[in-house]
Amino acid sequence: CNNELTSVGGVCTVDLLTLPPLPKVVQGTTLRTMSPLAVDVERLPYPIPVAGAETTEVDMAYVPPLMLSYEIPDDIVLVDETPSVAWWDDDSSEWKTDGITDVSLKDRTLTYSTVKVTHHALVQSRVACAPYTRWSTRPSSTGESVIVSVTPKHERFGGRPIEIEVGEGVCALASDAEPALRSLLGVKLAPRKLLARLSKCGVHLALEDKDCAYVGIEKKDAALEAAMCE
């Protein structure tokens, strides 16, 4: 993604589809129109263009929005009091929030209005956890692995650290400070898979060099870092 937003809880794809012609009953006989729509569906653009007009000619300010509602998973950590929903723009390869209004979340049910019929997602800042207020490593109680502890800066975490036990080729969430993540507690996964699962839950720890610009820090010089580690 080319901006700082990342999806959490998965992606919802919204399509507007045509319905096949309805059957008619005439004198006890059911008549069905045979057309490609009888065995297939057709995706429509939104707003539906007037016959002979192009979609680009429609003033989106006057397009009635669609209201969508669905439940989000229980294992999502929401870092913002007001949730944000975005749609995926293929042209710019980024999540965008324009065209989405009236976002609300009640009892895990997400509701919003939109004029964008495409891929939607609940989104958060990819750098919400950065920079860390502190981090450390220590041996585990058995001495066979290492505990990596990071404390996110965001107030949502209340200064509580996220701890990951790192072993030979696998790692697992080792702290239960965040109730929404308890389903991952003690589950051994490859490092990349665990980081991906945490990111999907709303705790993004796999930051990249491009994310430095969003938190106002300079990225490491690779050559200097390598020299200092030798």
Q: In which residue ranges do the predicted regions lie?
A:
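Proteolytic cleavage junctions
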Residues: 1-230
